[in-house]
């Protein structure tokens, strides 16, 4: 699905994910877990469509609100990483900001993934859902 968006294989997708996460000091496992949770393991099926390259539901608030659109996988993952960094830290971004919702985040309020509950998503247990996915990696 992403051959024309810069990631013809899942290996390419993961390499881009790791590169973007490491550049901003965000744990790649968190980015991956969130992308898998938000997209149903890249099957999508909710408001966000695969071609949007929006792997974290940025701006998708339900009721048909599709959210942000990124021109390629790298920019979509960069926006996700930047949004996670906004929640987790007050440090400046390394790369130019591509996250359209970056300025709406109270910086540094969720330095741990569990703190994303009730912030990134309405569910109070959202961060714990991410933690469960991360724990399954080992």
Regions found by a protein language model. Give the residues of each.
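Catalytic cores of secreted/periplasmic lytic hydrolases that degrade extracellular macromolecules
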Residues: 1-138
